[in-house]
Amino acid sequence: MIILGIDPALGSLGWAVVAKETAQLKYLASGIIRTNSKDAIHHRLAFINSTLEKVILEYQPNMAAIEETFVNTNSVTSLKLGYARGAIMSLIGRYNLDMREFKPNTVKKTVTGYGHAEKDQMLHMIKLLLSGTALITNSDEADAVAIAYTCLVTKNY
């Protein structure tokens, strides 16, 4: 089972690929997709879509796991995040991948044991739980690993 974990965002999207081979979890890859805030939104969404598509084609995941969105007090920010999620979900659908969504607190609790863990705690635990993640320093990337990890350990596939 290969899971593509996604921490959705318009400016800095985290992605990660984690596999379950027999009883072992294996980190395969992760990264950040950054868009320029000066670019038109449709160009930013197209860039996210095409870059994430390359990840899907390279790693051939069986499923995508994505963090659920919380509604921000800033409606413009929430709307832009919704655009990014829509572009991502459209791509997931185009490749006929199953998809699971996880609340941020569920991911934090699964990884750290505490549903309100801070970013640095998440990053620390990901490095302990999955070998190969030692060089990850970006919290968006670590969150994507954590989302894929949560999908696999909760057997939500």
From Swiss-Prot:
Pfam families in the cross-refs: RuvC
Annotated catalytic residues: D7, E67, D140
Enzymatic class: hydrolase
Binding site for Mg(2+) 1: D7, D140
Database matches in Gene3D superfamilies: Ribonuclease H-like superfamily/Ribonuclease H
Origin: domain of life: Bacteria
UniProtKB keywords: Cytoplasm, DNA damage, DNA recombination, DNA repair, DNA-binding, Endonuclease, Hydrolase, Magnesium, Metal-binding, Nuclease
Molecular-function annotations in GO: crossover junction DNA endonuclease activity; DNA binding; magnesium ion binding
Recorded catalytic activity of this chain's protein: Endonucleolytic cleavage at a junction such as a reciprocal single-stranded crossover between two homologous DNA duplexes (Holliday junction)
Residues reported to bind Mg(2+) 2: E67
EC id: 3.1.21.10
One biological process term in Gene Ontology: DNA repair
GO cellular component entries: cytoplasm; Holliday junction resolvase complex
Assembly: Homodimer which binds Holliday junction (HJ) DNA. The HJ becomes 2-fold symmetrical on binding to RuvC with unstacked arms; it has a different conformation from HJ DNA in complex with RuvA. In the full resolvosome a probable DNA-RuvA(4)-RuvB(12)-RuvC(2) complex forms which resolves the HJ.
NCBIfam families: ruvC
Function summary: The RuvA-RuvB-RuvC complex processes Holliday junction (HJ) DNA during genetic recombination and DNA repair. Endonuclease that resolves HJ intermediates. Cleaves cruciform DNA by making single-stranded nicks across the HJ at symmetrical positions within the homologous arms, yielding a 5'-phosphate and a 3'-hydroxyl group; requires a central core of homology in the junction. The consensus cleavage sequence is 5'-(A/T)TT(C/G)-3'. Cleavage occurs on the 3'-side of the TT dinucleotide at the point of strand exchange.
Record family assignment: Belongs to the RuvC family.
Name assigned to this protein: Crossover junction endodeoxyribonuclease RuvC
Protein's organism: Rickettsia peacockii (strain Rustic)
